[in-house]
Amino acid sequence: MPKIGNIELPDFPLLLAPMEDVSDPPFRKLCKEQGADVVYTEFISSEGLIRDAAKSVIKLDIYEKERPVGIQIFGAELDSMLQAVDIVEKSNPDIIDINFGCPVKKVVCKNAGAGILRDIPLMVKLTEEIVKRTKLPVTVKTRLGWDNNSIKIVEVAERLQDVGIQAISIHGRTRVQMYKGEADWKPIAEVKNNQRMHIPVFGNGDVDTPEAAVKMRDEFGLDGAMIGRASIGYPWFFNEVKYYFKTGEHLAPPSMQERVDAARRHLQMAIDWKGEKLGVFETRRHYTNYFKGIPHFKEYRMKMVTSDDAADVFDAFDEVEEKFGDFQFA
């Protein structure tokens, strides 16, 4: 079974990917309840932590019941990253993860995230110094390379392992691809098959069905899957994959009652965490998937995603429960 440092994981663990404005404490808690083995925070700016920016600091919050949990940081300045590690440690996470994969322009233009894939020596140096700075296990999330002409992920993964990381998660696209086209898992399998590699190698990108997870495990031989977009508004995905692993059959989708209950809990936890205004705003992105597949649903969805008043959103949940309570999801 794979391990991250001293953290023992089940065979082929399922990890919740760090996603900006998605993988916050309320959502992580729901995913953990539904079978996620490891969860990661949203990515956190090292510069923001040093400035004590409220938007960055609040992302350090952890629920005890979501462990093991990793806090992910990004940046390209060594001093800032090391200071950020010191701040992160005070929140007592189980793992520190370094983001070398975010393709967003505002991150890349600062040579952070996937931008650092243009400077592998700096990538390795930052990682080495962070590993030295902390007693926590350090992991890395990255991409295949900057573009198709610079894919050196086998070499990069080996060098990162050599400076002490405890696991690596690789998204099967380059930075130039962003999220377009299909994820290519073959280079990730090459990393895993490198005889020098002994740390867990997790695959990421297009793991959007139980069958895809089985393929990643059985055909590509990876150690686990990091789940991102497939989980947004659908925390049940983790248990569905695990059920498919055990039985070869699909778990019945959650009922309308289960979806409404989860949406209510999600919103209430978000309000308790960040207050009504932000709680209402930041849960909006989940509702489309919570209730995906219901015909003639636009009126209710619009109410959920446009109202600034929590009471109105809760009322919308009640209306959905009453009107569509007997709807059977395929």
Where do the language-model regions lie?
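Flavin-dependent oxidoreductase catalytic cores
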Residues: 1-330
